[in-house]
């Protein structure tokens, strides 16, 4: 498995991130999973890309020494010890592990981000984003930042109303955001890295 591993920290919180873009066929991924003989059965997923996501995620978790995670009612994965977050984008999967609550998102910048801009971007954010030199990439990083914060909380987040991402340059390794909503108010320092074609954001 050619997974890219990152060990990092922000605000005195450490985490371990693994990103994998499998080149194996669906059948090869299934064979690898069956060889592990974990006893866990793949759920009856109709869409082939969902089956591939499930297999790639389980294989990556196993590669990182993580067994089957429990899943809360809101869909958030949890471990008996420590915290876990998972994200998919096209053929890639990433997992992040930390001792504290954490959220992860990965996105590949495309022009399609403009079609959903109003769903996640506030007017104050658009005031500086619309003139950004790398607007598609910048919008993608804002979207990914808000997804990571949503995964941090696990539920009840209005992307445009509850979260504001502060102005940044697209290669900044740390981003700042403010959350104000049903969970109260708090500031986030977000870890950011471009890994291949993907923008990766971790909220701690």
Where are the language model's segments positioned?
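Core catalytic alpha/beta fold that binds nucleotide/phospho-ligands
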Residues: 1-204
